């Protein structure tokens, strides 16, 4: 019982502590690629979290302002639960493919809900809605900045992130089981299906974290911060924490699913191995971001289809046991 409590609290807490360094590492790598010095490693993540905590809080002009502000906390809880179930692989209610997909879908839905609630500009109530699309003509849809970001988030949920969920499914297909305990200790990556699945997973990872080139939900050119624009002060700190935690949580999930290395509190070396592998993903994503423009949906859809095709090939190989 004590070990389970330590796993539920300790593993996600350690992941969060490590994740605060990831934005700084990413910015440093990107700066070096662009022949700049860049900020200190602690500034973009660790110190930014505390900086936002001491900013002045403003209530957004939203239908449900309290719900809007607290939704990033829901995202943190979801990711905390995801890290917990990968360390407690015998917890059947959630430690399975259905639980993993369900939790991550909740995290994605946060952006759709956020964009449906707020109608202000940087915390200031406007005499008119910040309409960025549409006309006053009858039967013409009019959208605010946040609403347009929410529509884009919904498109990313339905089509963009599909390769990621397909990739999480492949290790379970080969084992003919949906439970995590059946794939832990089995390096699925070192198989033909695992190679295709890993390629599909990485493309899905970059889409899931909503970074360049898949940052259309909050591109600065039109919707600015999109659904999350009105998160201010301590609520912005919560959002920053959820973004950082997502970076390492999805990498940790790969280590568990594809290499069979679950962070076990009774075997500390597995925690080191799991998080070391998890850190590789945001670093690789940084190289993609440094050389990529923001893609439109007419470019995102083909990439998603190609990644899905790669995943389907891996799915066939997994069925064959290759």
UniProtKB/Swiss-Prot annotation:
Membrane topology: Multi-pass membrane protein
Entry's localization field: Cell membrane
InterPro entries: ComplexI_Subunit1, NADH_UbQ_OxRdtase_su1/FPO
Protein's UniProt keywords contain RNA-binding: no
Record's keyword annotation contains Transmembrane helix: yes
Protein keywords: Cell membrane, Membrane, Transmembrane, Transmembrane helix
Residues annotated as signal peptide: none
Domain of life of the source: Archaea
GO cellular component terms attached to this protein's record: formate dehydrogenase complex; plasma membrane
GO annotation, biological process: anaerobic electron transport chain
Annotated TM spans: 5-25, 37-57, 71-91, 109-129, 153-173, 189-209, 245-265, 268-288, 300-320
Main subcellular location of this protein, as a coarse class: membrane
Name by which UniProt lists this protein: Uncharacterized protein MJ1362
Organism listed in the record: Methanocaldococcus jannaschii (strain ATCC 43067 / DSM 2661 / JAL-1 / JCM 10045 / NBRC 100440)
Organismal lineage: Archaea, Methanobacteriati, Methanobacteriota, Methanomada group, Methanococci
